[in-house]
Swiss-Prot record:
Name of the protein this chain belongs to: PTS system N-acetylmuramic acid-specific EIIBC component
Regions of this protein lying in the Cytoplasmic compartment: 1-123, 179-180, 239-260, 323-334, 390-393, 462-474
GO cellular component entries: plasma membrane
Functional note: The phosphoenolpyruvate-dependent sugar phosphotransferase system (sugar PTS), a major carbohydrate active transport system, catalyzes the phosphorylation of incoming sugar substrates concomitantly with their translocation across the cell membrane. This system is involved in N-acetylmuramic acid (MurNAc) transport, yielding cytoplasmic MurNAc-6-P. Is also able to take up anhydro-N-acetylmuramic acid (anhMurNAc), but cannot phosphorylate the carbon 6, probably because of the 1,6-anhydro ring.
InterPro entries with a match to the protein in the record: Glu_permease_IIB, PTrfase_EIIB_Cys, PTS_EIIC, PTS_EIIC_1, PTS_IIB_1, PTS_Sugar-Specific_Components
Keyword Transport: yes
Top-level taxon of origin: Bacteria
Catalysed reaction, written as an equation: N-acetyl-beta-D-muramate(out) + N(pros)-phospho-L-histidyl-[protein] = N-acetyl-beta-D-muramate 6-phosphate(in) + L-histidyl-[protein]
Active site: 29 (phosphocysteine intermediate)
Enzyme class: transferase
Stretches that traverse the bilayer: 124-144, 158-178, 181-201, 218-238, 261-281, 302-322, 335-355, 369-389, 394-414, 441-461
Record remark: domains: The EIIB domain is phosphorylated by phospho-EIIA on a cysteinyl or histidyl residue, depending on the transported sugar. Then, it transfers the phosphoryl group to the sugar substrate concomitantly with the sugar uptake processed by the EIIC domain. The EIIC domain forms the PTS system translocation channel and contains the specific substrate-binding site.
Amino acid sequence: MAKEISSELLNTILTRVGGPGNIASCGNCMTRLRLGVHDSSLVDPDIKTLEGVKGVILTSDQVQVVFGPGKAHRAAKAMSELLGEAPVQDAAEIAAQNKRQLKAKQTSGVQQFLAKFATIFTPLIPGFIAAGLLLGIATLIATVMHVPADAQGTLPDALNFMKVFSKGLFTFLVILVGYNAAQAFGGTGVNGAIIAALFLLGYNPAATTGYYAGFHDFFGLPIDPRGNIIGVLIAAWACARIEGMVRRFMPDDLDMLLTSLITLLITATLAYLIIMPLGGWLFEGMSWLFMHLNSNPLGCAVLAGLFLIAVVFGVHQGFIPVYLALMDSQGFNSLFPILSMAGAGQVGAALALYWRAQPHSALRSQVRGAIIPGLLGVGEPLIYGVTLPRMKPFITACLGGAAGGLFIGLIAWWGLPMGLNSAFGPSGLVALPLMTSAQGILPAMAVYAGGILVAWVCGFIFTTLFGCRNVNLD
């Protein structure tokens, strides 16, 4: 497919999803054009047969068209322009669509809730990847060249410069999340950012670091700004809901002056009294659960084995708050490399299919076109073009990923837990320099590389033995 998404392809997709009048929203994640639809019965599932489309995921209120990294963003931008040129609907059409949209909301609340995470975190992912890569490369250079932490000179200065982006991102990350979350839940982004900033401020006048808020209690009640990302998400949701209620009763002439003011006062009160303690408990519980799963080899195997299924259903973005919680509690994201084993298992399965296929078959061409992205951590071309349509190889790919997750879990159980140095990043081989551990970057890279190798080999063996029987290898 050409680098640019053709207008003919987008017009065809628009027609097959029911036309502009059936589109409720248009957005994208890293690899998918996400179209919210009013009536899923109008969607033609044969969109997946269009040239340039790598796959399609259908839910009761959303169509996810898989294009691949970079292309999804361009497709969403071009589709938004097409929708902006669409003719205006009449009142009857709008009423009918609102009715269908309400029905969809009533029947797909869980998926809609998980889809919010894509809206909140997808715009941040390029920054996570860039900051994580810079930090990983700087750490690797410092380790290999034995640069002390307090060294002076051009090289240490350059390494510190490369690391500063990660420090800046994670110091003020909650403000970015608060802004995006408030918008995703229907509120004003800056209100969410201001509320999120309350979680960053310090409430101990004797502290020598941080930014003192100017008071240490809330009308005599202690302040415990815990919970971080979990608390910020809850607070941003509450902020958006409160803003909507205030706006309903606010006269138009006073809206700009008073709506945000009242919203902030009410939300901040709830944050200090309820949300911060609640977010802290949820944060501790979530961290405890996944830290114990990560140190349990069987738990790691289950997580890695099921992750491809989460990708197929489009709910894998729901793990991002967990990644952020683990960053806060451990200092690295120990879950991400475990889940990355799913993609490695699929690479092994694809190589087995290539080996078993006929020399000039279409299957070999499909694998050749998708294997390099798979090695680099982009799994959708392999999922939708190679393994999932044949089902058995998809299952054996999941088993290969589970084996890789088991390997990483065993190493952690034996005393070497490791993880990603960022909340989110690339997977596959590209993620190697982003690995870190308490023992340093090189042991972490070795464990991750070992997990990938185990997943490749097991995915290949499982598919060769069980994934090719009664499967179309043409």
